[in-house]
């Protein structure tokens, strides 16, 4: 099923603070993705933390890792059975997240 928290995204207009915190305090490599996003990595993954320069300081999304496609399908079915609408993301979104495939749903708080 889920093997790891792969990445997380936040909305914040305090990108300089995030650069200092993640870069200096956590030792993450800063990756300028252009546009409104700044990404950070700490290992061989393309990105682990993505900060979108938007008003507020809120969680935008979490990216969960699964071992195989079948696990993602099982997870989607469980979420649907629990009343959460699951959406198959398009390839453009998957590419922006540096993943092969992607589904998403909203949590009770709307994230």
Task: Name these PLM-found stretches.
Residues 34-37, 58, 96-99:
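Short acidic/glycine-enriched loop/turn segments that link adjacent beta-strands
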